[in-house]
Amino acid sequence: MKTLLISASLVAAAVLPSAAQAQAIPAAVIAVVDLDKVTSTCNSCKTAAAALRSQAQGLQTRQQALATPLQTEQKAIQAAIDALKGKEPDAALRSRVQAFQAKEQQAAQELQAQQTQVQRNQQYIQKQISDKLGPIYTQVMQRRGANMMVEIGQTLASGQTLDVTNDVVAALNTALPSISTTAPAQARPATQGR
């Protein structure tokens, strides 16, 4: 009986360390990627960034085009009000003020809509890029033998051999040859029937 217990304890002692060893976490093999470089040097990213800059410049140009005549009209109305020296404005001047306020509100709404569209376009571009990057990270990690990838801006220091940015850029150029720079139209809320 004593021999049986000793044999069983020896078998258990031999089996338990191998079970614990199977639970061990593998050593980290880390790769780093510079996402700023990826998104600024991939071919379609450069094209999309130029299109966004053009949209933003168009918005700024439109803002100036709307502001100039409004400012001129506002000065003329203010001069007419000042000329009254505190008297009540006549119906024509009140009508002119109301028309000016309507134009001003319409211009603000137009600019807000364009600004919203530019922001939606930017988010849509970023989504297209990030949708492609997820699988690319996995592919590059497997190809380079890494089991962890970190953005280079989150590291204190790293060796050049850990940098896989060029691999990610090359894969992104292949996976995303072009980017749509106009977000699809937003779904309209359904109107309730009668």
Where are these regions (language model features)?
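Domain-scale selection of a single, long terminal region
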Residues: 1, 10-12, 108
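Amphipathic, charged alpha-helical segments and their helix-to-coil junctions
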Residues: 21-194
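Bacterial N-terminal signal peptides that target proteins for export
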Residues: 1-8, 18
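C-terminal segment of classical bacterial N-terminal signal peptides
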Residues: 13-21
